[in-house]
Each structure stands twice: as C-alpha cells, then as structure tokens.
Curated annotation (Swiss-Prot):
Its EC number is 6.1.1.6. HAMAP family: Lys_tRNA_synth_class2. Mg(2+) 1 binds at residues 410, 417. Pfam families: tRNA-synt_2, tRNA_anti-codon. The keyword Protein biosynthesis applies. CDD domains: LysRS_core, LysRS_N. One of its GO terms (molecular function) is ATP binding. This is Lysine--tRNA ligase. GO terms for biological process: lysyl-tRNA aminoacylation. Keywords: Aminoacyl-tRNA synthetase, ATP-binding, Cytoplasm, Ligase, Magnesium, Metal-binding, Nucleotide-binding, Protein biosynthesis.
Amino acid sequence: MTEQVQDENKLIAERRAKLESIRPNCSANAHPNTFRRTHKAAELQEKYGQNTKEELEALGFKTSIAGRIMAKRGPFLVIQDVSGRIQAYAEKGVQADLKDRYQGLDIGDIIGVTGQLHLSGKGDLYVNMEEYQLLTKALRPLPEKFHGLTDQETRYRQRYVDLIVNEESRQAFVMRSKVVAAIRNFMIKKEFMEVETPMMHVIPGGASARPFITHHNALDMPMYLRIAPELYLKRLVVGGFERVFEINRNFRNEGLSPRHNPEFTMMEFYMAYADYKDLMDLTEELLSSIAIELLGSAQMPYGEHTVDFGGPYARLSMLEAIQKYNPDNATIQAMTYEQVKDLEFMRELAISLGIKIEKFWTCGQLLEEIFGETAEWQLMQPTFITGYPADISPLARRNDDNHFITDRFEFFIGGREVANGFSELNDAEDQDSRFKAQVDAKDAGDDEAMFYDADYITALEHGLPPTAGQGIGIDRLVMLFTNTHTIRDVILFPAMRPQA
C-alpha cells in the first residue's frame, strides 16, 4: 500500500469518526433535508457585489446559501454552488458558541449557512454565519489542489470529482447543454418536429458501422443497439411528417480515439422537397447563428487556429480536395473520374501513398481513404466535401450528371468530420440493388457493410417524396465550441476499461 493511499485511508477514517460523533445529536437524520436556500452565489455577487461595505451594513440583508466547502481559512469558508463561489464567516462570538461543530467541518462537506451579507476589507462578499447546518458529510477528501486534477484518467473515471474541482470542465458541460438547446430551438423555429425513434433495432441500418448486439428475452431474438436513426426517420417522412429531427444516442461497436466514443450523440434531421444543397445552406445558417448566440462572435479559437463560422463555407468535391492538397503529385493532378472507376489504378495509387488497403475495398472506398490520409486533416476551416462515390453512399441519391457519385456531402471543421448529409435515395428499386451490394460486401469481409432491410424497401415503395437528410455529431461540435481536442472532455461519462 502506497503512502498516499495510507494517508487517504486515514483521512477517510477520521471523517467517518466525525460523522459518527454527530449522529447522537441528530434527532432524525445526520443528513438533514429541511434547509432551504434563498440565493445562489452568483445572484448575490451580481446584485450586491458593487455595494460598499457601509451600504451593505445599512441594508442589513439576510440570506441563506448552500454548497460545498472548497476552502477553510480560519473563520472563513469558501462555499461553492452551481453558480459560483461565495465566502461565509464565523465571527468570534458565533465561532466560540459553535466551536466544536465548526472545527469538525472539512473541505468537501456540504453545508447551509444563514446570515447577513457583508463586504470584507479586501472587497469580497461574505455571509456572516449566524446559523449553519451540516447537510452532507464528505467522507472522502478532495484533491489537495482544488484548482484542478492533473490525472486525466481520474478525471474521466470520477467525473463527479472533476466537476467539483475543475471550473473548466464544468463550463465545458454547461456549453454542451447550451449548444444542444440552441440547436433544438433553431430546428423548431424552422418548423421541424422533434421525434423519438427506436434505440433497439431488429436490423441495424442507416450507417456503415459495426453494431452492438443484445438479446430480447421475451421475443427470444437478437436485437441491435442503433447505429443511426436514419431509416426510421425516413419512414416518418413517407408517413407525411415533412420535417423531422431527433437528438439522441447512437452506438457503434468500434475503436476509441480522441474523436471516437462507442456511445455518442447525433442530431439527425430530414426535410421533404429539398436537396443536399439546401442542407448545406441550412448548416451554414445553423452554425453561424448558434456561434453568435453562444459566443458572441462567428469566430472562435480552436487550438492554434481561428475558425470562422460566418460563411459562406468552402465547397469542394472529394476529387478536387485530393488534388488541392496533393499539389506535387502528378498522378493525382491528372486524375479523372474515369481513372477513379479503375480498381487497379486506385489500388496502385493508394499503395504508392503508403495506405494499407483491404482486398474487398471498392473504388469509392479507396478514394475515400486517399482523401482521409492526404486531405481531411488539412480542412481547418468549415468545408463541405461533395461528390461521394455511390458505392460508399448506399442511401444517397445518385448525381444526375455523374452516376458514379451521389448528391452527398460531409462537413469538416478542425480537420475532422462533423456532419454528413445527402439527397435521399427514394428509388425503391435502386435502393434494393444497393442493399444487395452491401450484403455482398459483408459476405466478402466488410463488417461495416449494411444489412438488407426489406421493411424499409416496402416503405419506399409507398413513396418517399424528394427528401434531404443530415446528421450532425453533437460531441465533435461541442469540442469546437469548447476548444477541446479529445471527445472524452465533452462526454460526461466516456467509455473506459474497468479498473483492475
């Protein structure tokens, strides 16, 4: 056992002893639930922080505050609630009267304090402790330096401690909540209806990904946690709901990385009588408006860069982007779509770029890999990449002028994909053929290929109007708004391997 663990165990034992010592004096419960707060710290700071000492004394304002003790300096306590911090002061007479109970308070304890509001000689507001009540005894100590945890794994495993001691973490999740609320309000104003679709699917679909598998005991059948809500949302458009959206979780049984978590949040929406270009316009309006609403500016820092959400955003085809970011590669500069359709040409090109290829990859998959390796990471400013090949876009409408590609885009900021959208494939026969091609790909070893969904084909046969749909990754968007570089910093409880 390390010295640090021994010290912590000793502190825990001391705190447990303090809790036991107060139990006999508690008529009902050592964790009372009758104290009522009248003000939060920020309310008091905002309303009375500009008053002089004399004005506050003349006012004689009495308040009740509650929160966690974050520091204890002689007669002063620093108390933190959800809004901020304020001090409490045990003047000599009160401290003498309540000396034993006051001395028993520890950093981390949750207390309620009632008293008159004053201003210290340093200009800090404080509440004179005329009365106080221990509401919850903290049995475990907080990290010594309450201005932050340094161990990243502890921050993720014990998010509750991270939120107590790290203001930056708290503000990141406050911003996350604001981003989600702003998106929801924007969509409702645009006359989209919020809906909820199943989280467990009989057939996984709507994206190319490996699903989590579970078992339904009552029905005695396998089921899948959803990888995307797309096919259910489009069924609703078939049913006559012309504008729908859903903000919810998706689950993909894949790797962990700074930009991937197996459980993540998406906002997915569909609008009838629109195409992928309308989606790009709507995305520009959405992001610029919420940036201004939440940050006061369309420009925001991200790492060493300044991201400009003001628009208009760059729009490049995938082939154009590859050529733009490989200016010295003569083969790429001369490449045409006819060559992109040549499987051997694409394999040789990928290998020449140092890409390890899979034998079952199609021309479209090879093009996407080349884009990902050579261009994607350079897209720091908001950029729409269009012209995705049909063989990697099984749910997207083919382009009228070039049937090899689809009317699809992915949206990139900060070198990563944030959104994916396209004009929806509403040709039931074409969708049937593409599902069958996905089944062949799965049989060839592609674990992320889609399943055949006969019920969705039946829905399309009833008629899906011209429709465009898009998914926006909430977690990655929040990473931008909080200037963080790992998805774990914006997910309250990220996936972690259990501790040994």
